[in-house]
Amino acid sequence: MPKMKTNRAAAKRFRKTASGKYKAGHANRSHILTKKATKRKRNLRQQNHVRAEDAGRLDRMLPYL
């Protein structure tokens, strides 16, 4: 059986935690930041946790993480 391919786009965006969950950075924080509130930008710095419904898809996309 051949090796499964890792989805490279997903591999660059998601990290797996020690407990097996996935985390990623928030969107909307690369440009056009002047109109966004400081509190909103500060909260966007935090890591975003992936919901359980989407974790199964990531398991298939990232078989070796």
From Swiss-Prot:
Residues 1-65 are annotated as: Disordered. Residues 50-65 have a biased composition (Basic and acidic residues). Keywords: Ribonucleoprotein, Ribosomal protein. Residues 10-44 have a biased composition (Basic residues). It comes from the Bacteria. Pfam families: Ribosomal_L35p (PF01632). The lineage of its organism: Bacteria, Pseudomonadati, Pseudomonadota, Gammaproteobacteria, Lysobacterales. Coiled coil: none annotated. It comes from Xylella fastidiosa (strain M12). This is Large ribosomal subunit protein bL35.
